[in-house]
């Protein structure tokens, strides 16, 4: 399954941990957004890992957007063709 994952984490340290966890499962696209092609069990493993890293009571959030094959082919992009390599951006 193809999943776009975005996150909003206020704490720099937790944000870095979320970034590292996601980097093991997908491609970093921009700041707090990853694209992942995962099997169902990989998704459950990632979701469990992220659930243990975030602090929802401190307004941390992670969103998962599931794209079907047809929808995936309709993704359009303007600019930003270079894929990011590594490293978290802290704003």
Which stretches of residues belong to each language-model region?
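Short, intrinsically disordered low-complexity segments
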Residues: 35-59
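C-terminal structural segments of small proteins and small subunits
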Residues: 53-91
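Extended, hydrophobic alpha-helical segments
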Residues: 1-42
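A broad, low-specificity signal for short, low-complexity segments enriched in glycine/proline
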Residues: 22-28, 50-53, 68-71
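Short amphipathic alpha-helical surface micro-motifs
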Residues: 14-18, 43-49, 70-73
């Amino acid at each position: 399954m193809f999943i776009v994952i975005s996150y909003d984490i206020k704490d720099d340290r937790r944000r870095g941990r979320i970034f590292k966890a996601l980097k093991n499962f997908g491609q970093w696209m921009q700041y707090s957004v990853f694209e992942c092609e995962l099997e169902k069990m990989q998704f459950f493993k990632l979701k469990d890992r992220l659930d243990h890293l975030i602090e929802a009571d401190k307004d941390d959030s992670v969103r998962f957007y599931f794209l079907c094959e047809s929808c995936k082919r309709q993704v359009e992009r303007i600019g930003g063709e270079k894929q990011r390599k590594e490293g978290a951006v802290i704003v």
